[in-house]
C-alpha cells in the first residue's frame, strides 16, 4: 500500500514540475501514439491535432470506460484548425482528484473498432486559490519567524525534496516588492521548515525588501510577506505583515520611563500590559503621555512598571513585561511585543562636587526601591537634620546639609577632599511574607573638592554698557472673521470653512498683535479675495484699494470703527464685505473664497497714516510698500446662493435686506396697478363723452 502511495505522490510531483506556476492549462501526453496534444483548461478540455491528421478519415469521439460513445456529450470540432473542444461535466468521467478523458480515434472506413483506438488521459481538478494569513509572528533581533497552518501533510514526509519546489517568496515595504524563488532565498539566509503541524518561514532582518526605520538609538523594521505555493490544480498564498521593534530607546528618570518610537508609516493606536489594553484617547488618564514630534515618545509613570531584583544593579530594576504596542499599518492592526527596562538607578541623586558655599546637595526618591522608602523616617547621619523640601505623594525629599554639621565626615583621597554622610530610612508597608536582610535602608552620600581648590573673591570693574540700537521689529498681524457686527468673538481656526449666503455680510478685522505702543497705527493697503489659497492666484476680486472702498465694486465695502472700550483702537481695522461682490455674469458664483489683506504700521504723526478716500493716485503709498505685510484668513468661506437647499436659518441682517427688497417690490407693483386703473378710468370717461357728443 505504501508503495502505491509513493507512486501516486511521484505522479503528482511529475505534474508539479511540468506545470507553469501561473498557468491553469495542463498539457497531457501520456499516450505517444495519440496524434495530438490534450490541454486541460480551467473550464474545458482542448485537443490540438497535428496538421497532418486527416480529421475526416479519423473521426475522434469521446467514450466512457466501456468504450461506448457518451451520448450527452456536446463537443466542437474545428476541421480547419484541427481543434476539438468539450466540457468537463458532460464529456469526461469524474474521478478522485480530477477527470478521466477517453478519446477514440477510429478509421471511419474500417468496419471493426479496436481497443487500442481508445486513448486515456487525466485532468487534475482545478481548485480555487487558498489564502492563509499568519497569526503567529515572532520578532527577534536578526530575523522574523512566520508560522502558517499545514494544509498538505504529504509535504512533511519529503521535506528535503519539496522545500524548493513550487515556492515563491515576495517581500514588500509598501512601495516595492522583491520576488525570490525559494532556492535563491535559501542562499540569502531564508529558511523554510515544514512539519505535520505548521509551515515556518524565517526571514532575515537584513533581507532585501525589509523596511528599516532609525531615530537616534531607536530601531524598528516592517515586513510585508507573501509565500506562494503552486501545484497542478491549486495555488496557495500565505500572507502576513509584521512590525518588529527589537531595540527601542529607553530612558528613565525619577518619575517616568520614556520610550522612543521612530517615525514610520504606522500609527500607534493602543498599548497593553498585564490585563490592560489602553486606547490612545485614554493614555493621559492612565498615566501615559506622548510627544509626537520627530517620531513618537511615550512617557509611562513608574507606578505602572514592575520591579525586580537584579544582579547588575544594587537596587531593584524597573521594567515592563510584555508591553504590547498596536499600530494601524497599511490598513491593518498589527501588534509587536517588547520588554523595556530601566537601567540601574540609585534612589539617591547627588551632585559630585560640593557647593562653593560649603554644602552638600542631594535628593532621595522613595519609589526607586522595592518596597518604597518611608520619607517620614529619613535621617542624615546621627543628627536630626531635615530635608529642605519633602513631598510624600511625589516620592521626593531634597537635602541641603552643611559640610561642618549633620554628622558629615571629612577625609583625603589623592588630590581630593571628600565629605560623606549616611542616610537612613525605613521601608514603607513591607509585605509580611517577605523577610528582608536589612530592616532599614542605608546609603552613603558624598561630594568632594579638589585639594588645591581655593575660594577667591574678586571685583571686576566694567565699562558702561553700549547704547542700544533701536530698529523696528517684525510685524505680527492677523486677519479674522466674526459672526456679527459686535465683533465679540472671532471664528476659531477649526471652525473653517465657514458658510455664507448671498446678501449676508462677512465681518472682518485686521489686528496688530503684541504691540502696546499707542503712537502706532494700523493702516490697510489692499484687501482682495481669490478662489485659491495663494494670495497671488487669479482670478481676484478687489475689496479695498489704498485703504478705501473699491470704486468699481457695485457693492461697496463698509468700514466700522473699533469700540471705544478697545485698547489702542488704532491697532484695529474692521469692515464688512457684501457677498454680491463675488458674482459676475461671466464667472458665476464661486463657492470657495479665500480672503487676504496687506497692511502697514505707521506713526500717528506720519502722512502715511492719513487716508483720503477716494485715493487720488495709486502711487500714494508706493514708497511704503516695503513695510507692508500680507495676511490671510485661517481658512476659506463657502458661498451659497439663496435657493441652495442647504440654507438653514437666515441671518437677521439678511432677513432685513430681503424684507426691504420685498416691500419695495410690492410697492412698485401696487403703483403700477394703480396707474393702470387710473388710465383705464380716464379712457372710459373720454369714450363716454364721445358717445354723448355723437348722439
UniProtKB/Swiss-Prot annotation:
Residues 1-24 form the signal peptide. GO terms for cellular component: collagen-containing extracellular matrix; egg coat; endoplasmic reticulum; extracellular region; inclusion body; multivesicular body; plasma membrane. One of its GO terms (molecular function) is identical protein binding. Residues 620-695 form a propeptide. Residues 451-473 are annotated as: Disordered. It comes from Rattus norvegicus. The chain crosses the membrane at residues 665-685. Can form homopolymers that assemble into long fibers (in vitro). Polymers of ZP2 and ZP3 organized into long filaments cross-linked by ZP1 homodimers. Interacts with ZP3. The record marks 156-157, 619-620 as: Cleavage. InterPro entries: Zona_Pellucida_Domain_gp (IPR051148), ZP-C (IPR055355), ZP-C_dom (IPR042235), ZP-N (IPR055356), ZP_chr (IPR048290), ZP_dom (IPR001507), ZP_dom_CS (IPR017977). Glycans are attached at residues 72, 161, 173, 206, 253, 382, 444, 563. Proteolytically cleaved before the transmembrane segment to yield the secreted ectodomain incorporated in the zona pellucida. Proteolytically cleaved in the N-terminal part by the metalloendopeptidase ASTL exocytosed from cortical granules after fertilization, yielding a N-terminal peptide of about 30 kDa which remains covalently attached to the C-terminal peptide via disulfide bond(s). This cleavage may play an important role in the post-fertilization block to polyspermy. Additional proteolytically cleavage of the N-terminal peptide of 30 kDa occurs in one-cell and two-cell embryos. It is a single-pass type I membrane protein. Residues 353-616 form the ZP domain. It comes from the Eukaryota. Residues 25-664 are extracellular. Belongs to the ZP domain family. ZPA subfamily. One of its GO terms (biological process) is binding of sperm to zona pellucida. Disulfide bonds join 40-123, 73-91, 354-447, 385-406, 527-597, 548-613, 602-609. It is found in: Cell membrane. SMART domains: ZP (SM00241). PROSITE patterns: ZP_1, ZP_2. The ZP domain is involved in the polymerization of the ZP proteins to form the zona pellucida. This is Zona pellucida sperm-binding protein 2. Pfam families: Ig_ZP2, Ig_ZP2_3rd, Ig_ZP2_N, Zona_pellucida, ZP-N. Expressed in oocytes. Residues 686-695 are cytoplasmic.
Amino acid at each position: 500500500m505504501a508503495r502505491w502511495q509513493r507512486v501516486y505522490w511521484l505522479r503528482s510531483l511529475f505534474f508539479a514540475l511540468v506545470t507553469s506556476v501561473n498557468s491553469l492549462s495542463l498539457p497531457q501526453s501520456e499516450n505517444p501514439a495519440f496524434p495530438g496534444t490534450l490541454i486541460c483548461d480551467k473550464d474545458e478540455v482542448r485537443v490540438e491535432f497535428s496538421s497532418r491528421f486527416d480529421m475526416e478519415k479519423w473521426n475522434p469521439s469521446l467514450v466512457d470506460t466501456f468504450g461506448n460513445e457518451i451520448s450527452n456529450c456536446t463537443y466542437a470540432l474545428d476541421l480547419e484548425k484541427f481543434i476539438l473542444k468539450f466540457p468537463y461535466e458532460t464529456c469526461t468521467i469524474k474521478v478522485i482528484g480530477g477527470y478521466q478523458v477517453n478519446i477514440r480515434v477510429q478509421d471511419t472506413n474500417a468496419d471493426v473498432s479496436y481497443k487500442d483506438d481508445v486513448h486515456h488521459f487525466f485532468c487534475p481538478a482545478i481548485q480555487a486559490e487558498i489564502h492563509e494569513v499568519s497569526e503567529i509572528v515572532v520578532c527577534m533581533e536578526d530575523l522574523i519567524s512566520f508560522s502558517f497552518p499545514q494544509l498538505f501533510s504529504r509535504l512533511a514526509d519529503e521535506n528535503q525534496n519539496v522545500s524548493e519546489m513550487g515556492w515563491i517568496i515576495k517581500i514588500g515595504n509598501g512601495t516595492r516588492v522583491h520576488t525570490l524563488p525559494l532556492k535563491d532565498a535559501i542562499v540569502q539566509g531564508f529558511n523554510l521548515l515544514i512539519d505535520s503541524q505548521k509551515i515556518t518561514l524565517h526571514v532575515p532582518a537584513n533581507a532585501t525588501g525589509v523596511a528599516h526605520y532609525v531615530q537616534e538609538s531607536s530601531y524598528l523594521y516592517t515586513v510585508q510577506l507573501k509565500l506562494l505555493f503552486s501545484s497542478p490544480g491549486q495555488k496557495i498564498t500565505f500572507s502576513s505583515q509584521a512590525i518588529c521593534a527589537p531595540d527601542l530607546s529607553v530612558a528613565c528618570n525619577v518619575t517616568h520611563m520614556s520610550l522612543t518610537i521612530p517615525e514610520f508609516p504606522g500609527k500607534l493606536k493602543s498599548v497593553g500590559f498585564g490585563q490592560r489594553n489602553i486606547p490612545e484617547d485614554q493614555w493621559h488618564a492612565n498615566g501615559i503621555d506622548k510627544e509626537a514630534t520627530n517620531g513618537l515618545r511615550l512617557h509611562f509613570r513608574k507606578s505602572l512598571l514592575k520591579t525586580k531584583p537584579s544582579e547588575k544593579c544594587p537596587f531593584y530594576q524597573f521594567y515592563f513585561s510584555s508591553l504590547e504596542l498596536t499600530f494601524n499599518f497599511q490598513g491593518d492592526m498589527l501588534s509587536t511585543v517588547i520588554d523595556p527596562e530601566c537601567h540601574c538607578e540609585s534612589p539617591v541623586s547627588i551632585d559630585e562636587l560640593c557647593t562653593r558655599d560649603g554644602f552638600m546637595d542631594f535628593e532621595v526618591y522613595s519609589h526607586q526601591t522595592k518596597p518604597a522608602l518611608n520619607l517620614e523616617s529619613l535621617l542624615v547621619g546621627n543628627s536630626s537634620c531635615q530635608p529642605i523640601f519633602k513631598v510624600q505623594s511625589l516620592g521626593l525629599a531634597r537635602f541641603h546639609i552643611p559640610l561642618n554639621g549633620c554628622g558629615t565626615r571629612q577625609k583625603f583621597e589623592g588630590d581630593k577632599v571628600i565629605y560623606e554622610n549616611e542616610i537612613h530610612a525605613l521601608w514603607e508597608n513591607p509585605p509580611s511574607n517577605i523577610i528582608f536582610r536589612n530592616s532599614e535602608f542605608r546609603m552613603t552620600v558624598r561630594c568632594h573638592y579638589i585639594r588645591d581648590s581655593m575660594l577667591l573673591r574678586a571685583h571686576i570693574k566694567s565699562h558702561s554698557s553700549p547704547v542700544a540700537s533701536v530698529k523696528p521689529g517684525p510685524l505680527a498681524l492677523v486677519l479674522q472673521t466674526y459672526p456679527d457686527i459686535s465683533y465679540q468673538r472671532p471664528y476659531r481656526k477649526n471652525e473653517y470653512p465657514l458658510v455664507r449666503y448671498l446678501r449676508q455680510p462677512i465681518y472682518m478685522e485686521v489686528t496688530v498683535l503684541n504691540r502696546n505702543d499707542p503712537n502706532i497705527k494700523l493702516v490697510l493697503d489692499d484687501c482682495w479675495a481669490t478662489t485659491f489659497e495663494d494670495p497671488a492666484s487669479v482670478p481676484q476680486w478687489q475689496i479695498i484699494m489704498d485703504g478705501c472702498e473699491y470704486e468699481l465694486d457695485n457693492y461697496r465695502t463698509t468700514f466700522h470703527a473699533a469700540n471705544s472700550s478697545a485698547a489702542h483702537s488704532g491697532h484695529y481695522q474692521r469692515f464688512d464685505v457684501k457677498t454680491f461682490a463675488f458674482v459676475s455674469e461671466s464667472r458665476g458664483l464661486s463657492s470657495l473664497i479665500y480672503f487676504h489683506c496687506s497692511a502697514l504700521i505707521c506713526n500717528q504723526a506720519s502722512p502715511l497714516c492719513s487716508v483720503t478716500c477716494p485715493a487720488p493716485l495709486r502711487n500714494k503709498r508706493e514708497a511704503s510698500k516695503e513695510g507692508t505685510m500680507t495676511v490671510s484668513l485661517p481658512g476659506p468661506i463657502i458661498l451659497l446662493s439663496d435657493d441652495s437647499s442647504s440654507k438653514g436659518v437666515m441671518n437677521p441682517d439678511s432677513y432685513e435686506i430681503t424684507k426691504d427688497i420685498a416691500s419695495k417690490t410690492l410697492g412698485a407693483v401696487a403703483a403700477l396697478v394703480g396707474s393702470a386703473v387710473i388710465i383705464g378710468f380716464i379712457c372710459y370717461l373720454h369714450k363716454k363723452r364721445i358717445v354723448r357728443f355723437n348722439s
